[in-house]
Amino acid sequence: DSSTQMGPLANQRRIAAMEALIADSKARGGNVIVGGSRCSEKGHFFSPSVVTNVSDDATLMTCEPFGPVAPVVTFDDLDEVLARANKLSYGLSSYVFTESAKTAHSVSTRLEAGMVNINHF
């Protein structure tokens, strides 16, 4: 279907992994504000999901989900952001969105990630 903007996950194990991330986040006080479940029993489609109030010890904060589940967290300063981002085991890719070239350079050089994207996906 040419109008598809998001395809299925690879298999049932990936669906189960997304469900586990959601369950773990909720058990640790997270709030699912959109999505949070598979789209239907047919195929391997999981709803794009956003979780707020995610604790730092939740699996969602310490892994790269490889699926449509994202945490949204608040922070007090850039040092806190960098500490959280650099806590990941893998850090394959990161994204910096800012209007300041100085901030983009400062943050991107301090991120421990394979790829740092600035102001784009």
At which residue positions do the language-model features occur?
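Conserved C-terminal structural/oligomerization subdomain of aldehyde/semialdehyde dehydrogenase
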Residues: 22, 38, 45-121
